[in-house]
Curated annotation (Swiss-Prot):
Gene induction: By interferon type I, type II and LPS. Interferon alpha induction is rapid and transient, peaks 4-6 hours after stimulation and returns to basal levels 24 hours after stimulation. Interferon gamma elicits a more prolonged response where expression remains elevated 48 hours after stimulation. Induced by infection with Vesicular stomatitis virus and pseudorabies virus, presumably through type I interferon pathway.
UniProt organism field: Rattus norvegicus
Coiled-coil intervals: none
Gene Ontology BP term (one): positive regulation of toll-like receptor 9 signaling pathway
Reactions accelerated catalytically: CTP + AH2 + S-adenosyl-L-methionine = 3'-deoxy-3',4'-didehydro-CTP + 5'-deoxyadenosine + L-methionine + A + H2O + H(+)
Protein name: S-adenosylmethionine-dependent nucleotide dehydratase RSAD2
Family classification: Belongs to the radical SAM superfamily. RSAD2 family.
Cellular location(s): Endoplasmic reticulum membrane; Golgi apparatus; Endoplasmic reticulum; Lipid droplet
Lineage: Eukaryota, Metazoa, Chordata, Craniata, Vertebrata
Length: 360
């Protein structure tokens, strides 16, 4: 008896789904065995990440790195999508791609095997994908299965709900919330306005949740033309973050500067002298961690949505091949990472909430 065409197609689809799940499970098991038994990384034997642009598959020249760089601290921008429109954003919504969850986990395993101790999830807005569930599953995986000392997130905070803390707060060490001003009109000018929602009020609510669910609280501020004269001393002291990261507004060609950019950040720029004046005004804030353009540009290991390292040394974000294709050791050669500057800017610090000994 012949099987009807529709039924045959359905059976084939179910078989393909089961086969795909089996392959993902075997890939995960193989990565775990490599970590446990110390097997060498097959590197180029890995399949190409689905959805990665074809142009990134071209062969790069080997820069001849004498000693492999250890990816101790990695910033994974798994999405470029965002619900805010900050005028100076330097990681804009140029694609809508997000890796399948199991592929992202496979890449995180490779990073762990290569020596990663801290992962920071960013975007875009990381809580946009699947209402924060995608992010939560990665956070739990990194803390529970990879046993990373530090798992952190950078978010604008607008989409975070208390339920997320209840489900995933135990696995998160640090939550960094972007706040560039305590004047709501300035936030609107910058692009952080969201209708009737008040960014500053939301910040205070998130601070309480972090305390309630024992997550270290951090604030990130980008100092620009619209907030450079603001006095934030009392607000920051009242919120009492473990760190207040203060960045100087930075231009990145192709992101917030140049013909193919989605933002025009030139009007937000400030001089080095203006940035120093802001720092002097806030020198008595003990948690202040300043980062000028010089310190910031080459001192971060950045992975994009395809798990490619982004090299910012030329003022652009030039991608390596994906670690899912060639492995971490090969891809990181093209990251442009300045390890000395990473250490000089204080990139290595007490980043596990177990070691922070906070008074919750």
């Amino acid at each position: 008896m012949l099987v009807p065409t529709a039924l045959a197609a359905r059976l084939l689809s179910l078989f393909q789904q089961q086969l795909g799940s089996l392959w993902s499970g075997l890939a995960m098991l193989f990565c775990w065995l490599r970590i446990a038994l110390g097997w060498p990384d097959p590197g180029k034997g890995q399949p190409r990440v689905r959805g990665e642009p074809k142009e990134t598959q071209e062969t790069h020249e080997d820069p001849g790195s004498a000693q492999p760089t250890t990816p101790v601290s990695v910033n994974y921008h798994f999405t470029r999508q965002c619900n805010y429109k900050c005028g100076f954003c330097f990681h804009t919504a140029k694609t809508s791609f997000v890796l399948p969850l199991e592929e992202a986990k496979r890449g995180l395993l490779l990073l762990k095997q290569a020596g990663m101790e801290k992962i920071n999830f960013s975007g875009g807005e990381p809580f946009l994908q699947d209402r924060g569930e995608y992010l939560g599953k990665l956070v739990r995986f990194c803390k529970e299965e990879l046993a990373l000392p530090s798992v952190s997130i950078v978010s604008n905070g607008s989409l975070i709900r208390e339920r997320w803390f209840k489900d995933y707060g135990d696995y998160l060490d640090i939550l960094a919330i972007s706040c560039d001003s305590f004047d709501e009109q300035v936030n609107v000018l910058i692009g952080r306005g969201q209708g009737k929602k008040n960014h500053v009020e939301n910040l205070q609510k998130l601070r309480k949740w972090c305390r309630d669910y024992k997550v270290a609280f951090k604030i990130n501020s980008v100092i620009n033309r619209f907030n450079v004269d603001e006095d934030m001393n009392e607000h920051i002291k009242a919120l009492s973050p473990v760190r207040w990261k203060v960045f100087q507004c930075l231009l990145i060609e192709g992101e917030n500067s140049g013909e193919d950019a989605l933002r025009e950040a030139e009007r937000f720029l400030i001089s080095n002298e203006e940035f120093e004046a802001f720092l002097q005004r806030h020198k008595d804030v003990s948690c202040l961690v300043p980062e000028s353009n010089q310190k910031m540009k080459d001192s971060y290991l950045i992975l994009d949505e395809y798990m490619r390292f982004l090299n910012c040394t030329g003022g652009r974000k030039d991608p390596s091949r994906s670690i899912l294709d060639v492995g971490v050791e090969e891809a990181i050669k093209f990251s442009g990472f300045d390890e000395k500057m990473f250490l000089k800017r204080g990139g290595k610090y007490v980043w596990s909430k177990a070691d922070l000994k906070l008074d919750w």
